[in-house]
Amino acid sequence: NYFMEMDAAAYKDRYESDDVGPGEPFINRPYKKLRPTFEEQFGWERQRSIKSWIYKSFYDQKTSIHWKLFLFLFNLTPTKQMDMGGHKFMFIYIKLLFNSSISSYKDFIYNLTIDPSMLNYLNLQLSRKETPDENYAREVQELFTVGKRPFSKFTEEDVRGVARALVGWEFDYEAIVYSEGHESVVNFRPWNHDTEDKIFSSFYKNKVIKGKEGDAGAQELNEVIEMIFETEEACVY
């Protein structure tokens, strides 16, 4: 009844207002390269500005599907807000969520995997080919894509396989934090990549991701994402 009683002007104001993405100018001032102060390095005032903007947007949102999906992703794929990258890592992450809210979820998971905040939060940044960290490999399956439903039968070997395939991605802290601008700088380090084959369970149709050397190793991330999203459970989830 409430919506039936709305006049055209109220409807237009509620449903057709443009969404506003994260602003950019305040973030462009570079830090001092040599011995920055704690405030300069982490930009608390800018971090507060981003947090204030995003939470006010949550509180004041109308019924925009864009903001509803943004809030969904914000809760589904959290990172640590006050991490080592300060306001720049936070800004890059928030902008990724905003731009991904009404686009391909598969593309979002790819970009989320190499987001600096996520690399730091779920330990891919510190993962090594001799001791691959399984934290993100587990969460990307259990929480972000196929879930823990009865038919999501990925195995511990699958977790280890994904972890091995993703070893080698690292953000460039110096380039992000101490440079002007707000762009993500993430590189693939071939010397830290597991070049052996990764063999997966029947849940993934016994997929084999061939180990690759050099820069070609970066392609294994694409193969992992494709493998996960080819499952029926990813669609159901």
Label the predicted regions.
Residues 1-2, 72:
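Residue-level detector of alpha-helical secondary structure
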Residues 75-83, 118:
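Short helix-loop boundary/capping segments at the starts of domains
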